[in-house]
């Protein structure tokens, strides 16, 4: 990796060697070339971007501002009655003070940048739109004072920036009619790297084994730089190890113990961390003295971290420690009264302790120790961790009535603990008799219009500052009812209470007074003016009717509003019937009658179980019938269980609302029983229990048990003990179950009204094993080979196998004998058994039976049946086999079969093959029964075939016959009949064509076939002729399709082209005339169309 870097750096150096050749003519060629690095290195940032800081360290570059450097933060979340939200501020119709969208970032400007401009960004929103001003080091910048300054929107631009005139702290001040806010401080810093002094450096001479420090003495620079050293010539860099160390704090090169290989020329190379510019120092020669080798000595620490190291939480700190000594010292680290964090890393042969992501508990005293065989030396320093200010509590925008008190509090954390300052409209807030600022609290005893404006709380410690902004609005307006209108007409029923609201808007808060007509309203036991200004009247009567005037007054004016109060008789209601019992499927009408003041309109509302009835979504069960103005009926049709409950009728008038309820009980089939539990299981029984079902207001008369297995068609009712399960029972036994079968059970309840829904199925259980009780059925014999007895049966279903290890016992004996021979078949799926005995003659009768067994024992046998052993395979070959070629692809084969006493044939197999192919390419065709002929098809024409015939049955094949041979017919002529001509006269068509002449490998023409059919029909007729002509009758009107083929012993040849002949009863038409006739008709139509078209279309 190092060699790769060296190559890259070397190439970058040689690219610009010509720039400084004259200026460095006094130096050696290699050193002059190295020095030119400083000119060739430029900022990595092009003309379209600038570096920006993200932390207080000036060594890193980012595009985002630091969170601690005075970043003004606005918080407008709802906090109290008077605040305004951020969404409110974005409403263009609402006026509000300035709010920062973007504050200026720290900027590092490379002095050698091609873009000679610096832009400090500032964006603020507000209504009206804010104006911008800028401050440098706390003093407002006069734009007209320097031609280099310009302001575009809020962005401050400096052309041709200069470090002497322009570096410093910049702030953006945004102002509109509501006040001003000041941004965080943004630092403008210039990045540069000067040149080393051109003076020749003196040689450093030491003894071998002695330690040495080579000074770098870097040139002026900003910000920090990175140090490295070149040995003798570029690109040979000094490699750091336990003996050599380059301090990034001092830039010096430390060699703890000089060796002869260290003799040479050393050059310090520095690189600006921002611009990447590089410069090289003059060489420093290192030589060895001639007065002997340096003896061993104890370590001397030449590089160490400061006594106090200060770093920010979350950053990375690097502490250096290196010593000179002979032998070369070893560096170790420790934390006094603690442990070095596990996240720490040791770099450069342990000379650098690096601790990333610093936390507060990483602080403490750290010690480095340098040790060799001659002794040791240590250094201690303290690591202190600070944190930037961070908000815990911010400000909210606030609006207050004039004269109200204000208390704002902002809180921030940080180490050291932050102090607070307050700004108003961008300027420090000075203490006054009414204004008090203590830490983060701002208190104003009695606000007035002069206090309105933009306020900022600034929390800061020695490492940074943060801003929080808020707007204070002072409200001052006469009373108004525009936003809180009072009902002009209020209706209340007799003996009820009424509240007449009065909440005028105004600042300060208006004082409220009430009048009825011309008289002031006096408070008494029934009448009271509430703190919010509303008028409350209890137990209203006719005497309380009239016009009420509410008046609001403050220092800016008054306003009043009038409300008219009417007192009516209270509404009464009656809902009937009160309590009713029904059965599912029945219907009922509930009647709701209202007695009310005749001047009031009434509205009826229906509820079920406290919820409004949705008449459109209830499936037609409910209907609201309004027959009279003062009553309403609720019709419930085809009632369901879910319709049971309390029905409410509410009558609503403009004055009051009253309601009444009625209860409806619905009887129906029972609900599903509770969880079904299988308590005990045997081979054929299961004891079940369940929770009672809901009877739905009709006692349960009985329960029914149902079961389901993999072998049943759905749920089936099972027999139980007791046979009848009464409604008061909660358990029963299912009986007559099959052993070793998985079952699910469920329970169904029944009452006089009907049968309810079933319970949830029980868990799946399996009955216990038992000896099988079902014997195989349909025991019979099957065909097999000679000397075989084939016994077949229908396998027993798994449902009746009753346990594991199920199999079959096959017993058989020759008919008329006494002893049984038994064989075990272990497969439960087996359906046959083959017994082979060479001494058994064919067709010997046997008595057979098949039994069953499983792991629990043997089960029953089937009934005894008599079957025969297999017959023998045929022993005689067919005779008189004859093969006759029928066509180009067919051979007809016939034979005779010699009847014999054994080996009755089931059919015959014909094997055939081409003369030109080996016998292993033989093909076969089978017949069944006693047929003694077959037609072979799909053969090749003009080919010699050989064939044999043999009989077969279930025992096997008989011997083949003698071989027979024949040659298939030659192919029919492939040339179709040509020059087909026709002449129609009446209902006949005379045809003629040129004769077909076959090729040498084709069969001779025996004649011709004329195929004709009526167009649109699939079936046609054929006329055969030996001459190249024929007469075709056309019996019906229509168009006929005609084609001609030659035929030979090889079959039909290729068809001629088809002709279409229309039936024609008058005159004589030839094929040529038909063509002319068709052309004539087409020409006539074309001419007619041409005459009809306008001339412009031609």
Swiss-Prot record:
Its main location: membrane. Keywords: Cell adhesion, Cell membrane, Disulfide bond, Glycoprotein, GPI-anchor, Immunoglobulin domain, Lipoprotein, Membrane, Repeat, Signal. Glycans are attached at residues 137, 195, 396, 448, 539, 778, 815, 930, 1001. Residues 956-982 are annotated as: Disordered. One of its GO terms (biological process) is presynapse assembly. Residues 98-189, 195-281, 299-384, 389-473, 479-568, 570-659 form the Ig-like C2-type domain. Gene3D superfamilies: Immunoglobulins. Disulfide bonds join 122-172, 216-268, 321-368, 410-457, 502-550, 592-649. GO terms for cellular component: GABA-ergic synapse; presynaptic membrane; side of membrane. It is a lipid-anchor; GPI-anchor. The keyword Cell membrane applies. Residues 1-23 form the signal peptide. PANTHER family: CONTACTIN-5, PROTEIN SIDEKICK. Interacts with PTPRG. Contactins mediate cell surface interactions during nervous system development. Has some neurite outgrowth-promoting activity in the cerebral cortical neurons but not in hippocampal neurons. Involved in neuronal activity in the auditory system. Belongs to the immunoglobulin superfamily. Contactin family. This is Contactin-5. It comes from Mus musculus (Mouse).
